[in-house]
Amino acid sequence: MAESMGKRYEDVQDVLKHHMMNRRGALRAGLGFGAAVLFGGSALSACSSGDGGGGTYAGNTKKPAPDEGGGGAPIGKANIPTPRDKTVIIGQVDFQVFNSFNPMIPNGSQGGNGFDTMVREYMFYLNLPTGELIPWLATGYEYNADFTTLTFKFDPNAKWNDGEPLTSEDFKFSVLLRRDNPALLGGGGNAKDFIANIQTPDPQTAILELSKPNPRLHYDYICSIVASFDILPKHIWEKEDPTKFKDNPPVRTGPYMLDKAIPNQKMYVYKKNPNYWNKAKLDPAPEFVIFQSTATSQDAASQAFKRAEFDVGSLDEQHAKQLRSEGYEKLITTPFNDPCPRALWPNHDPARGIISDPRMHHVISYLTDRDKIGKSVWPVETPPAQYPWANYDGNQKWEIPAVADKYKLEFSPQKAEALLDEMGATKNAQGKRMWKGKPATIEVITPAPVDGAEYIIGQTVVTELKKVGIDANVRSYTGSVHSEKWERGEFDISSQWCCQMSQDPGQLYNYFQTRYAKKVGENAVGRNQVRLKDPELDTLSKQLDNLDPESAEAKPLLEKALDEYYQNLPVIPVIQTNYPAYYNTTFWEGWPTEDDLYNVPNNWWGQFMFVIGRLKPTGQK
């Protein structure tokens, strides 16, 4: 059986190796995490240290006067219902949902509100910067020789915040709930494809009996990017309809509990769980953690940060540079490179008109000036993306230059026009492109605000489309509205991010399988929102699902699958990106820095729980 793993560095082959990289080399690469707009922070960019005499990437040692922030800035009074010196305040996106914490239904839970990081916990955490796999709710896992059973052991000390023990029965209930309800967000998927039965011989043991071998099923239970499998308390959820239950207040196992949500302040207040089960390993100093929407004006948000009314976020790189130049000494900027390039997602459903033709996807690619976007849209230069995954050192093994060179993602309006003519989308007397007797039109949607990078990327493409005779526009929607349109296929192109590959390309190809394609207007429940139907890619993907991706048997299949992907371009890579984290050291110290990147620094990732656990009060009142 799977025993406690203790301190372990991720030699689990395909998780860490495909996430990790030489850290400093990666910082130079200019990557970024795509869910920043949806899960936290405005559309930020990689940042430079600048020449200002203030905050740096490693922090400063000079201390301001007791009632001043860095650079002599006065400390403001944060509008919060808790003692400031006992509270960490995190600036976040515009919150909309305050009365529901059910992530399995549309608009059932607000992304980036702290629930995923402070209240929920996961079976395992992958610390990307260090490479350590951290067992948490589970203590270990083990496969049998032919990968047809997967055994998890759970920590006998784990308890829900209502005092009930977490057991293997909770895990079994949670897995089967999703397996047997594919309409739920996160439903179906690998659980439906692979898990035939679950045995629970004792409260700490769950044995997954698989319908076919799968050496990578444990990936689903590791918090590697943002979040992971959410174990639900059976004693609560078995009495509820999962399609309607709001789960408010949420019962989970984390070190914090929901104290209150304050809609008119767009604020969530979390308080320490006095009976937290894992205090021996994690006993955070802050009594409260608040996630709050920042001001819509970046100038106002920056001033709030300068007055130490926020400890995390509430800043973009433009204003961070300004604070440095002013000598603001309490700013720490920590760059972090994550797995999601910026990308354009074209809809494949014929109901959406010209965009459904795969040739139009190549037109869009030819009209995407990646060099310009990488140099001017992101505040620091970031490289173009050729593959639909991050250019980590560990991902180089998945690159196939012989295939990529056939489909070079280049900026060429001339090739775009020639391809449009070849498609029959010729210009009328007014210079407008026609498609099947009607004017060709394309709308780009994005969850980014109008000054966000994803919006600007969409705008650059719209500008080029107009030049070649296609009426086009770009629209910004709030996260919840965009999410609904995205899942229902009610878009032509979505400008956002591509986070579908965290371990190997087989994950991306599985995501696009035809069985997940729904009619426009139906919820895609988290997969194949672009409605791709590609039988050849389906066949290759299903073969790859059962293979070690680094095996000799998988190599030719990966090559064919990449070629098939490029032919259809169901997601169009744009640039690699970087999201720096901004911290204020007025009230709290111990933040991750470039020189001490002890864990993932992004506040919307599950691993941020460990950052909160490292903080110490400065003594500022």
Predicted features along the sequence, with ranges:
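Long beta-strand-rich cores associated with HINT superfamily self-processing modules
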Residues: 583-621
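Gly/Pro-rich hinge or "lid" segments in bacterial periplasmic/extracellular proteins
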Residues: 109, 114-117, 127-132, 224-283, ...
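Structural transition elements
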Residues: 72, 384-429, 448-456, 553
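Ligand-site clamp/hinge motif
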Residues: 155, 244-247, 275-323, 362, ...
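Surface-exposed binding/hinge segments that line
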Residues: 188-237, 366
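N-terminal lobe/hinge region of extracytoplasmic solute-binding protein
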Residues: 89-145, 176, 251-253
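N-terminal secretory signal peptides
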Residues: 1-25, 35-42
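Extracytoplasmic/peripheral linker and loop segments enriched in polar/acidic and small residues
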Residues: 81, 148, 362, 374, ...
